[in-house]
């Protein structure tokens, strides 16, 4: 028997058509029913493998098809990733996200990925990865390693998707999300505002996300970062109120999900970000760079938090994590142990 969708396109379109202040009021009420309005979840994102991606996503400077001046980099060493995670934790992040610019991981990559998940988890951080498409075995191996979240964005509506990406189908994205969910990993999935889509496309994106069998636990909403050399470099700027409206609708449709202000915050002033938090955003990426694009410096974010009376959300760290971390890091970085993994050898 087919599952009845939670939302219809007409309902979502009606939300987008509401007066902005009325929409914000509704979103804030729903937000307060499920979250502490003063708490913001803080994540850090690291590119563990940069550039030379075979996909043709028109917004992405990491695609090998576009001349953006980005230099490709090989997989980072395990100890480099763990050092970055340690710095992120010391700076206040509670979740460490790792991204690799490829279509999908190969089997030879899995031991490396498992080791860094285990190493970051041992620090008491939540873990997230974005690695492209996964098969069932890969999703289960990451779950067994302790991965908390897997990010795989839908980007836009099914109807507009073909204008942005041709090397991967929308259904393939949905299939990956299903495999991740079946493996027991939490889902992180959102999209991008500013690709040239219509309001109906924005409604269609949120409709897809909210009507998944289980909505994503984390929903990143990105504002397009226009990069010279990509096909979308000359797109029109996104109106701030349109972006805020998208955040509010996401909050109303997915009341228990974390809604993250993701890429594009460097282009937003403090007032726009404040209204996004009022609209129900309660998660940010923290650090000077998101994969390859600029992000506000940590100090700037902390100043904004103080102005707004916001606090970084804390996670509970189990006793013994520090000892576990030391043992695991020693094992991972000692060449004569069975668990040692040298990424440069790939």
Swiss-Prot record:
InterPro entries the record matches: Aldolase_TIM, BATS_dom, Biotin_synth/BioAB, Biotin_synthase, Elp3/MiaA/NifB-like_rSAM, rSAM
Cofactor binding, per record: Binds 1 [4Fe-4S] cluster. The cluster is coordinated with 3 cysteines and an exchangeable S-adenosyl-L-methionine.
Domain of life of the organism encoding this protein: Bacteria
Cofactor: [4Fe-4S] cluster; [2Fe-2S] cluster
Family matches, as Pfam families: BATS, Radical_SAM
An MF annotation (GO) of this entry: 4 iron, 4 sulfur cluster binding
Enzyme class: transferase
Alphabetically ordered keywords of this record: 2Fe-2S, 4Fe-4S, Biotin biosynthesis, Iron, Iron-sulfur, Metal-binding, S-adenosyl-L-methionine, Transferase
Keyword Metal-binding: yes
Sequence ranges assigned to domain Radical SAM core in this UniProt record: 38-256
Binding site for [4Fe-4S] cluster: 53, 57, 60
Pathway linked to the protein: Cofactor biosynthesis; biotin biosynthesis; biotin from 7,8-diaminononanoate: step 2/2
PROSITE patterns registered for this protein in UniProt: RADICAL_SAM
Enzymatic reactions: (4R,5S)-dethiobiotin + (sulfur carrier)-SH + 2 reduced [2Fe-2S]-[ferredoxin] + 2 S-adenosyl-L-methionine = (sulfur carrier)-H + biotin + 2 5'-deoxyadenosine + 2 L-methionine + 2 oxidized [2Fe-2S]-[ferredoxin]
A GO biological process held by the record: biotin biosynthetic process
Protein's job: Catalyzes the conversion of dethiobiotin (DTB) to biotin by the insertion of a sulfur atom into dethiobiotin via a radical-based mechanism.
Record text on subunit structure and interactions: Homodimer.
Protein family according to the UniProt entry: Belongs to the radical SAM superfamily. Biotin synthase family.
HAMAP family linked to this entry: BioB (MF_01694)
Name assigned to this protein: Biotin synthase
Gene: bioB
